[in-house]
Amino acid sequence: MYYSSGNYEAFARPKKPEGVDNKSAYIVGSGLAALTAACYLVRDGQMKGEHVHVLEKGDLPGGACDGYKFENLGYVMRGGREMDNHFEVMWDLFRSIPSIETEGVSVLDEYYWLNKEDPNYSLCRATVNRGQDAHTDGKFDISDKGAMEIMKLFFTPNEQLQDKKITDFFDDEVLNSNFWLYWRTMFAFENWHSALEMKLYIQRYIHHIGGLPDFTALRFTKYNQYESMILPMVKYLESHNVQFHYGVQVANVEFDCSDPKHKLAKRIDVIRDGKKEAIDLTENDLVFITNGGCVENSSMGSQNEPAAYNTELKEGGGWDMWRKIAAQDPSFGHPDKFCHDPEQTNWMSATVETLDQKIIPYIKNICKRDPFTGHVVTGGIVTVKDSSWLMSWTINRQPQFRTQPKDHCLVWVYSLFTDKPGDYIKKPMRECTGKEICMEWLYHIGVPEDQIEELATNSANTVPVMMPYIDAFFMPRAYGDRPNVVPEGSVNFAFLGQFAETPRDTIFTTEYSMRTGMEAVYTLLNVDRGVPEVWGSVYDVRDLLNATVKLRDGKKATDMDMGFMEKMAVKKVLGKIEGTDIEKLLKEYGVI
């Protein structure tokens, strides 16, 4: 497997890998990474669909990319997906996945046209004082000292960031700024999370720094992630006769690691219909393992019941499976680095379905748009800056479900601090019913207090979801804590998803999951075509200059607080570049 960039490799079709007709594949899980692996096995690996087996313990595919209406409960979206125009693997695959809505076009075509015709941007990024614009006004509000802290992290070698926290690099100069408000709520970072991952994020999205305050950097699908992404992939795979096995729980994968240069997956232990079974493997049987799981132990409440906070990792789950696998070889990772403390990895979301028009005026007052036009509504999350829960909420294009009533609006609410008492509901979010979470949200969008309970009861249905391990991948880590996608010496197995290691890309993104799927297939089948490298904006001087200026709210480098000697040094450098292309470039991007 090798990386590439440019159209030559992107538009090429690889030859059929040698010996693929004699191989089979078993994929543990059916999340985005797993489905991506299956798609690449079929498309570029040219493996017969009948030879590809997807083992899913639940009744539905998709993993964390869900969206479903539960009978007697309501609509549930545990999370949402923010896309980028440089998710190189994602678009490489979705150009080949047919739309399930429009005949003759791909998922990429559909998505591209939608976001061209209806570009995303926010008209209100944050509120205070019960629905009033917080007037962040597109500013990062970073001091020179704070900017230098970010720059220091940016240039610190990865080797020096092992097991380091964000607070090891940032103090209040950054943590009290609009920059951190935007960043933590958009990506769900906490102060104690990995400094390494923070650095990777800054480098990965350096080309989008200027688009963070108003979300012009983002793109969204038409419907929820399940209907817009997962279903088309499943239909594509089913059309190629890929075998989906639901209700099949993988308890363990057994390996022979006696030869470090020839590690072999020998058996998959499964539980099917309550009975233990074993799938014996040869070197021609490839195994793709989704290890860990950010939505494991997630629980749903209801309008009148809180979601249970269940932190016990039981036998048979994704974390238990990874622990059993990790015990067999040091290169298979250290799961307990990520799942040892759910108090540091949990947050909650809730899906609010409006049942009439009574709440809508308060939404319009904040987002300045009508939710029922089919176009962008909030344009990304609206953060309640003075919320003790650190609540944010968003409304994507409506309807979010094909079956959704035309006059109902779905609102996604999430909070990072589930253990803090609310501002209107005086108890932690994790103890609240759906109705109570809705009441807290209504309070913060400016509904008069004497109407809050009535509207939460009769004008909305709210389903809360607790996810104890949703931020597990953000915990401070070191090299080796996550297994490589294909560990050294592997003959017939690979790891997939957010807890597999691939260089430069960032976790908690659709692209990361899909990249692990592509890399796994290309490596094990020796597919002779380049895997598109992570977009290289961090190596583009134009993006670096633009981000430097935008991060400082348009201030020129010459306006920094400098001593006399520093000013003289800058003046001397500027004299040296006068009349050159360097001066021209620096002026073009507002650096000088």
Predicted feature locations:
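Beta1-alpha1 glycine-rich phosphate/pyrophosphate-binding loop at the start
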Residues: 1-3, 37, 41, 45-85, ...
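Helical element adjacent to the flavin cofactor pocket in flavoenzyme catalytic cores
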Residues: 203-286, 291-292, 304-305, 311-313, ...
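C-terminal segments that line or cap access tunnels to active or ligand-binding sites in enzymes
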Residues: 206-221, 280, 284-286, 291-516, ...
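Extreme N-terminal leader/targeting segments of oxidoreductases
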Residues: 1-25, 43-51, 69, 551-592
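Glycine- and aromatic-enriched mobile tails/lids
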Residues: 121-122, 126, 481-483, 499-508, ...
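Alpha-helix N-cap/helix-initiation motif
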Residues: 30, 79, 83, 222, ...
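Rossmann-like flavin
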Residues: 100-207, 218-220
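N-terminal glycine-rich phosphate/pyrophosphate-binding loop and immediately adjacent elements
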Residues: 13, 19-149
